[in-house]
Amino acid sequence: MVRYILDHNLQDIDVEVFDCISGELNRQNSQLQLIASENFVSKAVLEAQGSIFTNKYAEGYPGKRYYCGCHFADIVENIAIERLCKLFGCKFANVQPHSGSQANQGVFAALLKPGDTVVGLSLDCGGHLTHGSAPSISGKWFNAVQYQVDRNTGLLDMDEIEKLVLEHKPTLLIAGSSAYPRTIDFKRFREIADKVGAYLLADIAHYAGLIAAGEFPSPFEYAHVVTSTTHKTLRGPRGAVIMTNYEDIHKKIQSSIFPGMQGGPLMHVIAAKAVAFGEALKPDFKDYAKQIIKNSRVLVEVFKERGLNIVTDGTDSHIVLVDLRPKGVTGKDAVLALERLGIICNKNAIPFDTEKPFVTSGLRFGSAAETSRGLQESEFREIGNMVCDVIDNLKASDIVKASVEQDVIKKVKELTFAFIS
């Protein structure tokens, strides 16, 4: 065993950081985690990410490293690549991107020139910053054109998207979102892209685990390139991947990630990705994905029963997006009240929201994390009612408010204790 300069446990050498980690463990165990972009990884994933690979610098790709001593780094990265390709049925993959944003930027660097036109879903309609939003590099370096959802239904209007693409003739068309709960017609997106000779990028960061399990439409038959994070419904470490069935595109992406965007890969994270991909290949992962959707649909049912407005009127995924305007409540007020009582979600803009980004008119919920913890329909029905109790209580008298809050705190404690991680 390597002898370290300071061969001590974290608790012995840095009590401040140890206390932060202990506190975060307690927070995750004692609160309901309903943020759509979060999940609970397995102990095996944590072990891999905290492994000795933390020490290894492995600049380059398997078999083509700029450093010696990369034998096992090569093996584990190849395992990750092989498992990922098997999981999604694709031919080529890069498992080195540190984040979803860097994965998307890697695609832009590989396929675009500064000033090229990119068409993606607008941020206020559920798109992601990296899909051409003004504050992002994607909105600064490229001519970003944004499509929107239908004002009445909240759904993607493919005919309007086609008109926009035909008008602006982009080099890249992006399909994907960060707050769109419904299925995406990747086939139609490819047909539209082909009409102007555009590349189609499918950003499946939110849906990857559901796609891997066959519970959400797959883009791989249609998209030129696919990006995803690894830490949402895929239930892996924080990181990202890029996949394609086109060898010429794969070669360009290899160069754009290294040496273009990144230097040394995070081998401990890649090891954890390999573990997570292996877990997702097991039969019980399909059961997990099915339960995710069942649980989110129960939330929709309860929210509707209690008078909340659901954007798109339902969900086909882990995401539930709620419009709070009929309740006269902002997302900011609701999310702070929920957090105080142990229910963690995020404030979120709804389509065509007029509130500021730090206020918003909506809430976004996700069912993936608590489904990992073992909660099913009956527990999610209880969660849905607790959420509605808190929202309805925001304008109640102080006496009523205190009573409701104590009841919710008690129920959250009982529920989290019964399913403690």
Swiss-Prot record:
Pfam families with a match to the protein in the record: SHMT
Protein name in the entry: Serine hydroxymethyltransferase
Subcellular location: Cytoplasm
Enzyme class: transferase
Modified sites of kind N6-(pyridoxal phosphate)lysine: 232
Positions bound to (6S)-5,6,7,8-tetrahydrofolate: 123, 127-129
Gene from which the chain derives: glyA
Organism: Ehrlichia canis (strain Jake)
Biochemical pathway: One-carbon metabolism; tetrahydrofolate interconversion; Amino-acid biosynthesis; glycine biosynthesis; glycine from L-serine: step 1/1
One GO CC term on file: cytosol
Keywords for the protein's UniProt record, in alphabetical order: Amino-acid biosynthesis, Cytoplasm, One-carbon metabolism, Pyridoxal phosphate, Transferase
NCBIfam families: PRK00011.1 (NF000586)
Site-annotated residues for Plays an important role in substrate specificity: 231
UniProt xrefs under InterPro entries: PyrdxlP-dep_Trfase, PyrdxlP-dep_Trfase_major, PyrdxlP-dep_Trfase_small, Ser_HO-MeTrfase, Ser_HO-MeTrfase-like, Ser_HO-MeTrfase_PLP_BS, SHMT-like_dom
Lineage: Bacteria, Pseudomonadati, Pseudomonadota, Alphaproteobacteria, Rickettsiales
Enzyme Commission number(s) of this protein: 2.1.2.1
Cofactor entry: pyridoxal 5'-phosphate
Subunit structure, interactors included: Homodimer.
